[in-house]
Amino acid sequence: MRRFSNICVILFSFLYATGHGASEEVMACLRQERSRVENPSQTIVNVVAENPAYLHCSVPPDAEHEIAWTRVSDGALLTAGNRTFTRDPRWQVSKKSANIWVLNLRRAEQQDSGCYLCEINDKHNTVYAVYLKVLEPPLPSPSSLQKKSTKLMANMSGDEVVLNCTVTSTDKDEEVLDVVWTRDGNTINFNDTEKYILKVKRDAGVVIETMRIRKATMEDDGNYACEHSQQKASQIVHINKAEAQTSNSATFPCSIFSISIFMYFLYL
């Protein structure tokens, strides 16, 4: 009876906030909740595509309980404790406080909409359900496109490829959202710290992200891009290995790299 009451409270809050009936998909998600107490966190999260999403899960205070986040649509285990198990680098988990865990989605896409479960390893096997709704972004106006620019520059530093992505907005009060890096259209996994290093600098209206590709070889060839909102700056990186000789009478073969770069700017 308590569980039914909790679901009714959740659905009433959703109806009040949205002004219309909850879909069967949302109701089916919330019915998967198993808890002796009402979920203190937000159970329905609405976010516009290309923005970050945060799903909260509260555990009993003064208790050492780990949690696991799963995606209902495919049963995928996303995180357990502070470890991430998905290969999608957009997903991360963090601990906001002693009893609040947050599933972070760096850049939400419409296909991320659906039901997510927070499972707590307490004696009651508590399960909290959170429904994520990713809304279609509004079409950008021509004036807003003119206010933003995205540039990507590349160079070599030793055996590393260094790519600098600069996002500039003429509106100093506008928050510059996360930049997404891709290679040949696939999101780059920055959890692979042996291969990639990412540093971010932020200032009023400007974000500079620097990506280093460590120990670059021809296998790292590709079309690298940094994307922000409706704009993308892209560079084709091609690494050639050559033989160099010293000017002395004795020669010592060594490997050097040269980089061929082609840059173009796209409006999506």
Curated annotation (Swiss-Prot):
PROSITE patterns noted in UniProt: IG_LIKE (PS50835)
Carbohydrate-modified residues: 82, 155, 164, 191
The keyword Lipid metabolism appears for this protein: no
Gene behind this protein: zig-8
Keyword annotations of the record: Disulfide bond, Glycoprotein, Immunoglobulin domain, Repeat, Secreted, Signal
Protein name: Zwei Ig domain protein zig-8
Subcellular location: Secreted
Function recorded in the entry: Together with zig-5, required postembryonically to maintain the position of ASI and ASH head neuron cell bodies and ventral nerve cord axons of PVQ, PVP and HSN neurons by preventing their displacement that could occur during body growth and movement. May act by reducing L1CAM-like protein sax-7 (long isoform) adhesion.
